[in-house]
Amino acid sequence: FPNITPIQEKSVKAGLLEGKSLLACAPTASGKTLIATMAIYNTLGKGKAIYLVPLKALGTEKYKEYLNVFKDSPYKVGLATGDVDSESDYLAKYDLLILTTEKLDSLLRHKVSWLAEVKVVIVDEIHLLNDTSRGPTLEIILTLLKNLIKPQIIGLSATIGNPKELAEWLEATLVIDDWRPVELKKGIYAEGR
């Protein structure tokens, strides 16, 4: 892989393709999405994958992205961000599901049978565990997943204040890198200058 980024290389070495759970912390645009895609590709054919997003808009973006990635494959990509208590049996036909946190919470509470087929869960923006409105739901979901179906969990974030503690709680290997494709310029802006 001549163009593999440091966070991607570290993730593969940490067991990404062996089904190990990871917490990948790296700057925006450093290649975290490809880490998710590698884990998904590695799983499909053996089980289902879930890509968990905090917001409908991000879900729609990831859905379009993965529709394109899997357009020439036998795998089906689905999106469910709507009414959390609506009928969900139709979701069983998809191999990769892009879900909001609230939708997955509803599916877990309704004991949807096909969830037992899930082998990997990607948690985008996992730092939102610290968010007072979305964090508690995400924490419950991750706890249920770890205890009920024990999937590989891949947490992705650019900003985590306590990565070691979070990785330990997730039972995941922490992978951190600060490489970024564009140099970060820092400065102070005061009084219009």
Name these PLM-found stretches.
Residues 1-190:
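Conserved P-loop/Walker A NTP-binding site and adjacent catalytic elements of P-loop NTPases
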